[in-house]
Amino acid sequence: STLLGSLLQVLKFNLDRKAERVRVFELGRVFLRDASVKSSDTTVEGFHQPMRVAGLAYGAAQPLQWGSKEQGVDFFDVKGDVEALLAPLQAQFEPAEHPAMHPGRCARVRVAGREIGYVGELHPRWRQSWDLQQAPVLFELELDAVLQRPVPGFRPVAKHQSVQRDLA
């Protein structure tokens, strides 16, 4: 399963209420068949349930401004969002195929050689079935990979100021 369907429902809900620019994200579990998973208090037999983070951008890339023309959100806007989310880790993007995404406008996201998700434009067939004026750009990443990024640590402020003197 995937979180992308839920994001499209939220998008449609907002568009039906005349929202022209939509940016949403979601955290949740997806369900993948895996015969090696045994039943326990936190698992269901035969299903792996990893946490994922997904996001969607639709409409203008920037709010309306008098000095510039309105430009729709594109793949590179959301790719930049994914890079910012993963920073300081260096993500690599390579062309890929995903059933929900446009062929030729989809990329696999890798961090340290490990595939962690996808980013791309919604497939034209799904765009048509959801009756969308333009294609939203979506991403879905493994939450564990996002949480592995190093976070800057706290360093207390020195109690005494440093002193520098020129003794010459």
What residue ranges belong to the model's regions?
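Extended beta-strand-rich architecture
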Residues: 1-168
